[in-house]
Amino acid sequence: MRCLLCLCLCLFVAGFAGCRRQSSAEITIAHEVSPQPPRVGRLLIVLRITSASRKPVMGARVRLEANMSHAGMSPVFAGTLEVAPGDYRANMEIPMAGDWVILVHLTLPDGEKLERQFEIKGVAPA
């Protein structure tokens, strides 16, 4: 009887272990910026968001925030549109030459929020 109870408990715990939520650390965001090299004005930013199993993350809410790498410039914001499963596109107006840090504010379909960042170095004058 004791062995049966132990077996049932082990199966119960194993069942929950298989149902764990995907960790935000397992989300990958790849980015492409055009034109190349980047210039002051409108940039097209395409994000490809995938899970650890390389499946596209669909239905996320994604906003971008661009900040210059030095103080003194107001941030620039842009929304995104999901144009294909896991592919999100934004048009962002970059008003000044220099180095920019892009923050990706991401809300997953289950409501979990996370942030990632990447740099756009050497934005040239228009």
What name fits each language-model region?
Residues 1-4:
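Positively charged n-region of N-terminal signal peptides that target proteins for export
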Residues 19-126:
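N-terminal soluble domains immediately following signal/targeting peptides that reside
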Residues 6-15:
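Bacterial N-terminal signal peptides
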